[in-house]
Amino acid sequence: MTNTLTSTFADLGLSEKRCQLLADIGFEAPTQIQTEAIPLLLSGRDMLAQSQTGTGKTAAFALPLMDRIDPEGDLQALILTPTRELAQQVAEAMKDFSHERRLFILNVYGGQSIERQIRSLERGVQIVVGTPGRVIDLIDRKKLKLETIQWVVLDEADEMLSMGFIDDVKTILRKTPPTRQTACFSATMPREIKELVNQFLNDPALVTVKQTQSTPTRIEQQLYHVPRGWSKAKALQPILEMEDPESAIIFVRTKQTAADLTSRLQEAGHSVDEYHGNLSQSQRERLVHRFRDGKIKLVVATDIAARGLDVNNLSHVVNFDLPDNAETYIHRIGRTGRAGKTGKAIALVEPIDRRLLRSIENRLKQQIEVCTIPNRSQVEAKRIEKLQEQLKEALTGERMASFLPLVRELSDEYDAQAIAAAALQMIYDQSCPHWMKSDWEVPEVDFNKPVLRRGRNAGGGQNKSGGGYQGKPGKPRRSSGGRRPAYSDRQQ
């Protein structure tokens, strides 16, 4: 097994040209999966790798492939992915790792013109990245011929299994030469994946990147209890004002919630868009590019759609709706705090969610820090702080000079400080979101009060959330108005 202390890509056997390219695009040191997988793949071994999303697995198979591909040859490599979004990400990454003008990489998936893909195949490509369904379609049309394939990669094989593509994958593998080199990447190892590996891989090397079920330590987790009578959308507004995320994904359960929440956040002045299954392929691609380029800061997404929304340097993840299990929770928040950076995960919890929250915390073997929703004075102080920073920037700008005559004229009648304060007040009022102009105060949330079960006739709907959290005898009730550390007096 490769020495896990290897610190450079050159030590892994990659070419000098490839290593220089990696340095140019900011890749400093290999991850564990890259350290283990790259030498094996360069040596020609088949490989089975168990690795989670976010560990650098794309580079683990793409880099050795790029070092061995012939840019002037026929079709040599086939990479299968469960979704078109992942196919796009893989293809884009491989182009970043190559910069070889003569090398052609083709994406094939549904939602795009198959005629255009056929024309590209006829012109000649060296690498095909695609979903099993579209690959099968092109094979059946006799437009995609696999006789010259030397390398096959199965990316997220367990996801292809769960989406019903495993038979298509087997059909495709049977049409490739038995001498091919095959690499299979899977986060989990169900029986069907093991059977596929035994059938189609030749004495594969096993690489396992262990990832504990606890949350990554670089991610700060916080939860906010939504006050009774408040909606989660209302609770989220002051939280976003205080956090002011550089980039965030807000997870919701349904497409309708995504649409409603996006509309409400847009009305409040946030740079936000929605990402769900109803969007066309072109709409998805456009949104992903805008998000990666920083043109929008917030994306409201469902879990299924968000598989294609992989963005580096994500500062926040917001669980607007809690997921049904701890694994999904970990996967969601694992999108932030990557590559040695810190991140923050926020969860909104209503009384009906408390049993689900307990199950997540029990699985994680940790309690999530409880915070109170920021009150009006805190939000106003934050907005004034931002206004102060904007003012400092404006004082160094060139456009300020055009306003100096007006200031001198006003100074004849008014105090200079009063003029500045009035101008700032005007700017503050104009930029203040509509929800802040209404009378609102954050109700105190009694964390020790049990969550009562209510029937239809009790006016509470079908709230069957159970007993909630109770404090130890003698514990004082917690006051509101600031952040509190995670507390240990909740019943588990």
Swiss-Prot record:
InterPro entries: DEAD/DEAH_box_helicase_dom, DEAD_box_RNA_helicases, Helicase_ATP-bd, Helicase_C-like, P-loop_NTPase, RNA-helicase_DEAD-box_CS, RNA_helicase_DEAD_Q_motif. Helicase inhibited by the slowly-hydrolyzing ATP analog ATP-gamma-S. Protein is rapidly degraded upon shifting from 20 to 30 degrees Celsius, the degradation machinery is only transiently present in cells grown at 30 degrees Celsius, is inhibited by commercial protease inhibitors and requires full-length protein expression (the N-terminal fragment does not induce proteolysis although it can be degraded by wild-type extract). Residues 38-207 form the Helicase ATP-binding domain. It comes from the Bacteria. It is a peripheral membrane protein. The keyword Cytoplasm applies. GO terms for biological process: response to cold. ATP binds at residues 51-58. It is an enzyme of class 3 (hydrolase). This is RNA helicase CrhR. It comes from Synechocystis sp. (strain ATCC 27184 / PCC 6803 / Kazusa). The gene is crhR.
